[in-house]
Amino acid sequence: MVQDTISDLFIRLKNASHARLERVEGIPYGKYQEEILKVLVREGYIKGYEIEEKEGKKYLSVQLKFGPGKQPVLNEVRLISVPSRRIYAKKNDIPKVMNGLGIAILTTSAGVLSDAEARQKGVGGQIICYVW
């Protein structure tokens, strides 16, 4: 049983992206993971995802996105908040990742948002990770 499902999700996506796999299957479903995937779709880091059911359990299947020459769009994910150490940012202190080339994913009172969406809505929250 995986203790930190968020880090498991990102490790699977990053490894599959570096291996240039089109699809990642068998990711255990969680509402929080689904919200993170919605942000990655909105920001253009993955093509999409599906929820599948096998033997009464739900799983996520993610379609990865690649650029010209099969270069992965999702290059790196750096986890910021982990279960033993939570990092928060106020609305004015949300960092820009790679000078705006990447995104930060935050969990806020308005849901799971990218850094740009959080700034636009004027909310801060827990920084989950940086993606570029």
Swiss-Prot record:
Asked if the keyword Transmembrane belongs to this entry, the reply reads: no
Coiled coil ranges (UniProt) are none
**PROSITE patterns named in the record:** RIBOSOMAL_S8
Pfam families, from UniProt? Answer: Ribosomal_S8
Keywords assigned: Ribonucleoprotein, Ribosomal protein, RNA-binding, rRNA-binding
Q: Which InterPro entries match?
A: Ribosomal_uS8 (IPR000630), Ribosomal_uS8_CS (IPR047863), Ribosomal_uS8_sf (IPR035987)
On subunit structure and binding partners, the annotation says:
Part of the 30S ribosomal subunit. Contacts proteins S5 and S12.
State the family named in the UniProt similarity comment for this chain: Belongs to the universal ribosomal protein uS8 family.
UniProt cross-references to NCBIfam families, sorted A to Z: PRK00136.1 (NF001109)
The UniProt entry, under HAMAP family, shows: Ribosomal_uS8_B (MF_01302_B)
This chain belongs to which protein, by name?
Small ribosomal subunit protein uS8
Organism encoding this protein: Coprothermobacter proteolyticus (strain ATCC 35245 / DSM 5265 / OCM 4 / BT)
